[in-house]
């Protein structure tokens, strides 16, 4: 007889409020309480949910025979963060076909190009910052990344209020777990930018030369699905936003990188005139150590038995991304900031999962992870080697229930000067 056991259960008719109140630590707190990496709870109106963590759990979670993504994300997340019918919601051949389109954009040359564009925009911003008494790095980084990613994707911005566009792209990921007016603002920003990009798609398909034929915008607008059909204009807009929005969200990591440089001066000192390997380790440790995505959702595709528990078709399962990155069985001293730990990391796709795990093509690991790393390396290099600044007294605390979590002050810099 196969081994089975009853899972621990987090009592309550609906634990959505505790989940929101505890944020990144909700699953970890209960894993510690139950002394088990898997437990049952009720969320989203009393729906039964399985929460789990660990390397083996991630391997199972990213098994496409056992789990699907369609229908997993709550509607409020689709209405702000992901959009309808984007690559994150697809499964099987349709997902692999769409994901390949994205991965084909992530060539070595294109990753260097986006990093170069970010550095160019950062240098332009430096000229302005030098005239200012202080700047808020998080908001300024959003503006820099908005300009750079629009140039990289080939999105024409003549006559566009770039500060407003930056705000709208930020609204989409900042409002994902919010309620009330903040969430409404995120939905409205998505609707407006989708309409803007749908009009561009129509222009491209009418033969108007609004962008180059080798740009990501053109490639997505003319992409055909597995049936040979052009994507719906709204889906094109969603997928172009799947390049714009996550790139602007790297501003969260830039603020967290600045916090790491401030809090760990010994680690910063090692980056002065260091090689790319040292920067890569610092980037990876920043992504491991600080909170970014809290969980990943999926739905059981068909009944199966794993780790003594019968997973039933249709059950919602949450993988603890933050918890995996701090799991004591996966990381030595998980709550310490140690970039050198990545010197001996085996590059497993299932332990280090700040932006999801598994395979890039067949699985649901974030297609923009390489872009994120490339941009972060370049920005950290600028902050260490190409500019001076003072970090004044301010509230640099991180909220473990606010998603995304950034320093409360937005990370204020004073007396910014280029070196």
Identify the residue ranges that each predicted region occupies:
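Cytochrome P450 catalytic-domain helical core, especially the substrate-recognition surface
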Residues: 2-28, 75-202, 419
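Conserved cytochrome P450 K-helix E-x-x-R motif and the immediately C-terminal K′/meander segment
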Residues: 17-35, 273-309
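Cytochrome P450 heme-thiolate "Cys pocket" and heme-binding signature region
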Residues: 344-408
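Cytochrome P450 catalytic-core helices
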Residues: 237-240, 248-272, 368-387
């Amino acid at each position: 007889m196969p081994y089975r056991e009853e899972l621990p259960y987090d009592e309550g008719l609906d634990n959505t409020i505790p989940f929101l109140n505890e944020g990144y630590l909700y699953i970890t707190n209960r894993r510690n309480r139950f002394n088990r990496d898997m437990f049952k709870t009720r969320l989203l109106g009393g729906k039964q949910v399985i929460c789990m963590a660990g390397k083996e759990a991630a391997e199972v979670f990213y098994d496409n025979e056992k789990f699907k993504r369609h229908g997993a994300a709550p509607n409020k997340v689709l209405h702000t963060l992901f959009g309808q019918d984007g690559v994150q919601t697809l499964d099987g051949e349709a997902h692999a076909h769409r994901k390949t389109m994205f991965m084909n954009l992530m060539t070595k040359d294109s990753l260097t190009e986006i990093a170069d564009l970010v550095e160019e925009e950062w240098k332009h911003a430096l000229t302005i910052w030098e005239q200012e008494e202080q700047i808020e790095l998080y908001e300024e980084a959003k503006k820099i990344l908005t300009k750079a990613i629009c140039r990289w994707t080939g999105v024409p911005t003549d006559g566009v209020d770039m500060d407003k566009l930056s705000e709208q792209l930020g609204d989409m990921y900042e409002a994902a777990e919010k309620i009330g007016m903040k969430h409404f603002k995120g939905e409205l920003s998505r609707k407006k930018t989708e309409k803007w990009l749908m009009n561009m798609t129509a222009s491209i398909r009418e033969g108007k030369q609004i962008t180059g034929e080798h740009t990501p915008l053109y490639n997505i607008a003319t992409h055909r699905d597995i049936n040979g059909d052009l994507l719906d204009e709204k889906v094109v807009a969603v997928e172009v936003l799947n390049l714009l929005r996550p790139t602007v969200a790297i501003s969260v990591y830039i603020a967290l990188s600045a916090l790491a440089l401030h809090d760990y001066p010994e680690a910063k000192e090692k980056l002065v005139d260091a090689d790319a390997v040292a920067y890569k380790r610092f980037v990876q440790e920043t992504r491991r150590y600080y909170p970014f995505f809290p969980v990943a959702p999926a739905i059981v595709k068909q009944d199966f038995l794993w780790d003594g528990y019968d997973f039933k078709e249709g059950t919602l399962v949450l993988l603890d991304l933050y918890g995996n990155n701090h799991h004591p069985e996966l990381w030595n001293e998980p709550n310490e900031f140690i970039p050198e730990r990545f010197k001996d990391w085996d590059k497993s796709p299932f332990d280090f999962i700040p932006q999801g795990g598994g395979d890039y093509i067949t699985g649901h690991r974030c297609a923009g992870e390489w872009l994120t790393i490339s941009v972060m390396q370049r920005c950290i290099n600028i902050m260490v080697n190409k500019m001076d600044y003072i970090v004044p007294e301010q509230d640099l605390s991180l909220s473990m229930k606010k998603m995304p979590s950034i320093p409360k002050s937005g990370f204020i810099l004073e007396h910014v000067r280029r070196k």
